[in-house]
From Swiss-Prot:
Assembly notes: Part of the 30S ribosomal subunit. Contacts proteins S9 and S11.
Molecular function terms from GO: mRNA binding; rRNA binding; structural constituent of ribosome; tRNA binding
Source species of the chain: Shewanella oneidensis (strain ATCC 700550 / JCM 31522 / CIP 106686 / LMG 19005 / NCIMB 14063 / MR-1)
GO-annotated biological processes: ribosomal small subunit assembly; translation
GO cellular component terms given for this protein: cytosolic small ribosomal subunit; ribosome
Keyword rRNA-binding part of the UniProt annotation: yes
TM regions (residue ranges): none
Job of this protein: One of the primary rRNA binding proteins, it binds directly to 16S rRNA where it nucleates assembly of the head domain of the 30S subunit. Is located at the subunit interface close to the decoding center, probably blocks exit of the E-site tRNA.
Family under the similarity heading: Belongs to the universal ribosomal protein uS7 family.
Name the record gives this protein: Small ribosomal subunit protein uS7
Length: 156
């Protein structure tokens, strides 16, 4: 950690096709082993599949899916005395987006469709309709925070 000044957030370049920073971030989350062009192909193919199935604006569906997966609270471990408590904390907006994208991609990777593009499209469509594994993950995190509400005074 630097001692002199706080390091600012890096500016992310928008994606070349839709000029969206959100999509560029999503491409970076999907990317494995530095293969960005492969990640871009997967995302753009998934968006094409969504456009075929729904006919609506595919970026709106992506935004709706992320909205339904974004957590508002999470639990963090806090050691007090000899025991560890799961303390519910509010999630900052940047982390909220990052978690939503990560959970969507994880859920898509566990699906059964043939290609990653189809899996991702299916998971995004499910999430936009408030169902699917990623939404279930968010519900589990919220349930955990609700169950541990008694330890909220240990927040830092």
């Amino acid at each position: 950690m630097p001692r002199r000044r706080v390091v600012g957030q890096r500016k992310i370049l928008p994606d070349p096709k839709f000029h969206s920073e959100l999509l560029a971030k999503f491409i970076n989350v999907i990317m494995q082993d530095g293969k960005k062009s492969t990640a871009e192909k997967i995302i753009y193919k998934a968006l094409d599949v969504i456009a075929e199935k729904k006919g609506a604006n595919h970026l709106d569906i992506l935004e709706a899916a992320l909205d339904n997966v974004r957590p508002s609270v999470e639990v963090k471990s806090r050691r007090v005395g000899g025991s560890t408590y799961q303390v519910p904390c509010e999630v900052r907006p940047v982390r909220r987006n990052a978690l939503a994208m990560r959970w969507l991609v994880e859920a898509a990777r566990k699906r059964g469709e043939k290609s990653m593009a189809l899996r991702l499209a299916g998971e995004m469509l499910d999430a936009s309709e408030n169902k699917g594994t990623a939404v279930k993950k968010r519900e589990d995190v919220h349930r955990m925070a609700e169950a541990n509400k008694a330890f909220a005074h240990y927040r830092w």
